[in-house]
């Protein structure tokens, strides 16, 4: 119980006070003793309340007294009065008075004195003894009081110490209490902080996951954005082409079946639908185009008239030279033409290349034999020579010698088309139309609608004779010429040995002129004349002819067709553009290789040029291919010139030569060769092959990526048989334009198709027909689509048909891809050699380097006709080349040709089959980063865990590219996350490239999957392979089984996890497990 503190004022002024601790035992006397001075007596304690004062008796208990006041205690003040209390002093006075009275009688006090109490009785007198006694008593009292004072002081000191102790204990208790409260508060705060920290950590983890997801999505969005942009560009281009077709500017370019495919993602489906609708509309325009073709035929007649006038002018200017040309052209094909190489043999003519190059006459001479027909046939070349035409570049002047044989069917038309179209600028619509009309009128085939594959003439076989074509055809040739005229770059055809021409009068024979035109088209690309005077100087209004090029009969069967000058670069579906080398078919045993590589120019590669409408053949990108056109020596053309002029060079092919090679669209990138029109040139000599090899030696090769199957090159240069990078444009959606002009169809329609295929196989124009035409087994008609996308194009057969060689002739139209290109036979550099045809002995023998003029092999000393005999074994399809679908799939997946992948995959027996290095199409698509192809292959059910020779799976490839998106796609398709390589035993997560962009995300994802496998999804994983238990503590399982992981590792095993399958438990190897089950191969149908 806490003692109460009583404040006592020692004086009236209330300035001097003391505090007295009050306990229940404290009396008023104790308070007075505590407060009065030592030795002081007669003091009492008085309480004052509201001005009234009352003395407190000594025996009064102060504690109880204070409690009685209760709340009013603060109003009461206690004073120490230094006098006795009135009650006690009255009692003492009474006693003293009695004593004084008694003393008065005894002692007489001299003066008035007061007693100590102040009750003096002056009359009392004390004796000495009394005084002494009093003094003694007082002394004793003083001593007693002093003793009491000392005792009180001691007690007071003790009480103060006790009070201090109590206060200290109280303060300490209070402090302890406060500390306890503070500790509790801090503990509560700590708990809250810990809870908040847990929330913060969780939010950090969530934020990290979200940021990773956001990064992945942003990467996906960027990819999709790029895909959409590319799709938009493609759609714009296609829509522009469609608009041009509607306006009539582009003849014969239109995708067939409305299928324009490309590396499109799901977002592009809508765009594809729109394109399909437009293609359908284009098909509906076929009838209109046919009418337009009739008009074009009329215009061709006008062109023929113009050609006549031009020929008359030329006769005046070069009368003697023209006569010589006529004589040479008709007399012997071998004699070099002193005059311009314009002379084309109308009849099938097999030309034996002369050893020497023919010098070009100073002025290009236009052979009279060509007359209007030849001029029409060379519409472009002739015009180039004409004063009206802008001078050709010398290089471009060279004309590809073409077969004079009756195979003009394609070559003539195609040549003219190519000449016109190949020009760097697309031919004017009228020009295209003219050629197209010619093709229609001559070929009798229904005019193809631009954009719609045009049916080839019923028989595209060799054009048997130079028999005059209908005047319409001549005019169409002239029209082509007119079309070509606009192209300033067109060079006069290089001098060719005149093929034996049927006597040609100045008056053009419509048929012959067309044939000549077809055969003699001036390749726009300059070719260096092998030997002899330079090509016509551009300085002349008329470009001089390039050095004479021996005109070899172009074998229609497989020989590549020279591109008609009219043809501009063909447009190929962007998706179908992939680099391909031209593979030459083996020449027939009988075949006499033409001495001159003039035809070689027919195949051209086009690089970097924008894809032109199918109506125009794309210039060949490879300059080196063009050189052969001259005197058979391969001489590189400048790519630019070649691109523009190659068509013309090809164009000059002799009408007899039935196959012209269209220039292919140039490849997407200089490092990738665009598909070369595959024209296995028939009857190709070893010398021609050697020249081609030399040209290809410096040619850009497709980049060797992991998937490419490349044949080793021998010392002689690339193995042309194996380089045959078959144009698969048709399958890939690429367009090969058919020649505008088709000579009247002959019985051998298949042969013409083959020629077209061969000649036009160079859809990309990679080879300028560097290879002399080699005899090749005719490709199946389907395989050999008419190369020209123009009148001669046929609707494309189904992809299966395209790929499979057919033994029976089909008047069947060669397959055309959506762009009206006939589907070329798919081939890739990966294919060692055409499956269907074994290389002939000549091909197998390393060809000797070509001299400027190649002498025909002795064996082929006798002239051979290019015309195919109806019953010839070569006529059958059995020997046609068929390309390995797997090689095509491997290359298409590497190059990003989504359309080709979609089409060819059904031809592949096992899309997961690897090449000799263990590379599968999925490896290629992953390494090249083609997400849409990867997704397609995975959805198709290819083996996502196929490993190459070093154990690299597609997941390793994706990780090495730091592609999180592909890694996620592969993991979700059943990729084995713990699969390791053989050489360095590293998983995909170890293959992430630390110095490359995207390393952190890719590494985090793969390591995260490794850590979460067997933990997330309640420990459920999926077996990716079948496994039979080898020990009693192991589990057997089958692919696709859902296994629950109970323990990822223990003291005994780290690579084996303890798992449960059904009611069994045991060890399972972790590298056979995946986070997702593998996608099952889907049913193989073409649906």
From Swiss-Prot:
ANK repeat boundaries on the chain: 917-949, 950-982
Modification Asymmetric dimethylarginine, positions: 552
UniProt keyword Nucleus present: yes
GO terms for MF: p53 binding
Keyword Phosphoprotein: yes
UniProt name for this protein: Apoptosis-stimulating of p53 protein 1
Compartmental location: Cytoplasm; Nucleus
Amino acid composition bias (Low complexity), ranges on this chain: 459-476, 610-625
Pfam family for this entry, one: SH3_1
GO CC terms of this entry: cytosol; nucleoplasm; nucleus; plasma membrane
Gene3D superfamilies, alphabetized: Ankyrin repeat-containing domain, Phosphatidylinositol 3-kinase Catalytic Subunit, Chain A, domain 1
Keywords attached to this entry: ANK repeat, Apoptosis, Cytoplasm, Methylation, Nucleus, Phosphoprotein, Repeat, SH3 domain
Free-text function comment from the UniProt entry: Regulator that plays a central role in regulation of apoptosis via its interaction with p53/TP53. Regulates TP53 by enhancing the DNA binding and transactivation function of TP53 on the promoters of proapoptotic genes in vivo.
Family: Belongs to the ASPP family.
Disordered: annotated span: 82-122, 374-415, 442-721, 734-878
A GO biological-process term: regulation of apoptotic process
InterPro entries listed in its UniProt record: Ankyrin_rpt (IPR002110), Ankyrin_rpt-contain_sf (IPR036770), ASPP1/2 (IPR047163), ASPP1_RA (IPR028319), ASPP2-like_RA (IPR048942), SH3-like_dom_sf (IPR036028), SH3_domain (IPR001452), Ubiquitin-like_domsf (IPR029071)
Misc: In contrast to its official gene name, it is not a regulatory subunit of protein phosphatase 1. This name was given due to its similarity with a protein that binds to protein phosphatase 1.
Domain SH3 as annotated: residue spans: 1016-1078
Subunit structure: Interacts with P53/TP53; the interaction promotes pro-apoptotic activity.
Residue stretches of biased makeup (Polar residues): 87-106, 393-405, 506-520, 570-589, 805-831
SUPFAM superfamilies: Ankyrin repeat (SSF48403), SH3-domain (SSF50044), Ubiquitin-like (SSF54236)
Biased composition, class Pro residues, residue ranges: 445-458, 523-536
């Amino acid at each position: 119980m806490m003692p109460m503190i009583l404040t006592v004022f020692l004086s009236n002024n209330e300035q001097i006070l003391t505090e007295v601790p009050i306990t229940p035992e404290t009396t008023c006397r104790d308070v007075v003793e505590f407060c009065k001075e030592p030795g002081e007596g007669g003091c009492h304690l008085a309480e004052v309340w509201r001005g009234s004062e009352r003395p407190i008796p000594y025996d009064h208990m102060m504690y109880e007294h204070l409690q009685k006041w209760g709340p009013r205690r603060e109003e009461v003040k206690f004073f120490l009065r230094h006098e006795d209390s009135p009650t006690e002093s009255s009692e003492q006075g009474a006693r003293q008075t009695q004593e004084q009275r008694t003393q008065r009688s005894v002692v007489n006090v001299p003066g008035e004195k007061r007693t100590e109490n102040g009750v003096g009785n002056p009359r009392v007198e004390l004796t000495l003894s009394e005084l002494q006694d009093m003094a003694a008593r007082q002394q004793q009292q003083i001593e007693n009081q002093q003793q009491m004072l000392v005792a009180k002081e001691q007690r007071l000191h003790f009480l103060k110490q006790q009070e201090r102790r109590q206060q200290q204990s109280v303060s300490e208790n209070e402090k302890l209490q406060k500390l306890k409260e503070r500790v509790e508060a801090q503990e509560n705060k700590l708990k809250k902080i810990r809870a908040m920290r847990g929330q913060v950590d969780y939010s950090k983890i969530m934020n990290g996951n979200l940021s990773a997801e956001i990064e992945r999505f942003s990467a996906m969005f960027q990819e999709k954005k790029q895909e959409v942009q590319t799709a938009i560009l493609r759609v714009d281009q296609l829509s522009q082409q469609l608009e041009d077709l509607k306006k009539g500017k582009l003849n014969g370019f239109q995708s067939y079946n409305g299928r324009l495919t490309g590396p499109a993602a799901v977002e592009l489906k809508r765009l594809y639908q729109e394109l399909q609708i437009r293609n359908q509309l284009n098909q509906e325009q076929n009838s209109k185009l046919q009418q337009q073709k009739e008009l074009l035929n009329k215009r061709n007649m006008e062109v023929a008239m113009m050609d006549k006038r031009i020929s008359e002018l030329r006769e005046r200017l070069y009368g003697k030279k023209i006569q010589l040309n006529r004589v040479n052209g008709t007399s012997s094909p071998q004699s070099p033409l002193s005059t311009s190489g314009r002379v084309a043999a109308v009849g099938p003519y097999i030309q034996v290349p002369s050893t020497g190059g023919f010098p070009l006459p100073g002025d290009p001479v236009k052979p009279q034999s060509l007359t209007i027909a030849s001029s029409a046939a060379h519409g472009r070349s002739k015009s180039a020579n004409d004063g009206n035409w802008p001078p050709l570049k010398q290089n471009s002047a060279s004309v590809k010698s073409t077969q004079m044989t009756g195979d003009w069917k394609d070559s003539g038309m195609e040549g003219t088309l190519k000449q016109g179209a190949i020009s760097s600028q697309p031919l004017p619509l009228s020009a295209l139309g003219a050629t197209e009309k010619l093709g229609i009128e001559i070929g009798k085939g229904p005019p193809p609608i631009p954009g719609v594959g045009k049916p080839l003439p019923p028989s595209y076989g060799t054009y048997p004779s130079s028999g005059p074509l209908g005047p319409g055809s001549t005019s169409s040739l002239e029209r082509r010429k007119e079309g070509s005229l606009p192209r300033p770059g067109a060079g006069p055809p290089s001098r060719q040995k005149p093929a034996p021409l049927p006597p040609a009068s100045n008056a053009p024979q419509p048929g012959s002129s067309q044939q000549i035109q077809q055969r003699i088209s001036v390749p726009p690309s300059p070719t260096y004349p092998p030997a002899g005077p330079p090509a016509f100087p551009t300085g002349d209004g008329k470009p001089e002819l390039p050095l004479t090029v021996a005109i070899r009969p172009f074998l229609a069967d497989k020989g590549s067709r020279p591109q008609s000058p009219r043809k501009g670069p063909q447009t190929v579906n962007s998706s179908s553009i992939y680099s391909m080398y031209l593979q030459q078919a083996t020449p027939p045993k009988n075949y006499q290789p033409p001495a001159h590589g003039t035809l070689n120019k027919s195949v051209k590669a086009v690089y970097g040029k924008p894809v032109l409408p199918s109506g125009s053949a794309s210039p060949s990108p490879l300059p080196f291919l063009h050189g052969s056109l001259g005197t058979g020596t391969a001489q590189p053309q400048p790519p630019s010139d070649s691109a523009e002029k190659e068509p013309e060079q090809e164009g000059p092919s002799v009408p007899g030569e039935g196959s012209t090679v269209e220039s292919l669209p140039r490849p997407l990138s200089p490092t990738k060769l665009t598909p070369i029109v595959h024209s296995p040139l028939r009857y190709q000599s070893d010398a021609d092959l050697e020249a081609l090899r030399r040209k290809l030696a410096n040619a850009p090769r497709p980049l060797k990526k992991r998937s490419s199957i490349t044949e080793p090159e021998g010392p002689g240069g690339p193995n042309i048989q194996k380089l045959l990078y078959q144009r698969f444009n048709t399958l890939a959606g690429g367009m090969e334009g058919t020649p505008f002009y088709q000579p009247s169809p002959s019985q051998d329609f298949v042969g013409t198709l083959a020629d077209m295929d061969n000649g036009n196989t160079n859809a990309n124009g990679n080879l300028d027909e560097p290879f002399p035409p080699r005899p090749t087994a005719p490709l199946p008609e389907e395989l050999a689509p008419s190369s020209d996308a123009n009148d001669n194009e046929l609707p494309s057969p189904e992809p299966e048909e395209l790929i499979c060689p057919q033994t029976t002739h089909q008047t069947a139209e060669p397959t055309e891809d959506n762009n009206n290109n006939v589907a070329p036979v798919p081939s890739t550099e990966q294919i060692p050699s055409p499956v269907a045809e074994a290389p002939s002995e000549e091909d197998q023998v390393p060809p000797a380097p070509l001299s400027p003029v190649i002498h025909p092999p002795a064996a082929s000393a006798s002239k051979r006709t290019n015309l195919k005999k109806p019953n010839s074994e070569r006529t059958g399809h059995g020997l046609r080349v068929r390309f390995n679908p797997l090689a095509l799939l491997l290359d298409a997946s590497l190059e990003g040709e989504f359309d080709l992948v979609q089409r060819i995959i059904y031809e592949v027996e096992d899309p997961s089959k690897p090449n000799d290095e263990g590379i599968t199409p999925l490896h290629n698509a992953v390494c090249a980063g083609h997400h849409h192809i990867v997704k397609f292959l995975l959805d198709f059910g290819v083996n996502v865990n196929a490993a190459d020779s070093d154990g690299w799976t597609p997941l390793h490839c994706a990780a090495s590219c730091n592609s999180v998106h592909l890694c996620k796609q592969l993991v979700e398709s059943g990729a084995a996350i713990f699969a390791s390589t053989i050489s360095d035993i590293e998983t995909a997560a170890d293959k992430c490239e630390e110095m490359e962009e995207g390393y952190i995300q890719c590494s985090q994802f793969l390591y995260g999957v490794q850590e979460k496998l067997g933990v997330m999804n309640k420990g459920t994983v999926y077996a990716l392979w079948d496994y039979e238990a080898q020990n009693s503590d192991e589990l057997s399982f089958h692919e696709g089984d859902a296994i629950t992981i109970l323990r990822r590792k223990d003291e005994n095993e780290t690579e084996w996890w303890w798992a449960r399958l059904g009611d069994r438990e045991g060890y399972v190897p972790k590298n056979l497990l995946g986070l997702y089950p593998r996608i099952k191969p889907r049913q193989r149908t073409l649906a």
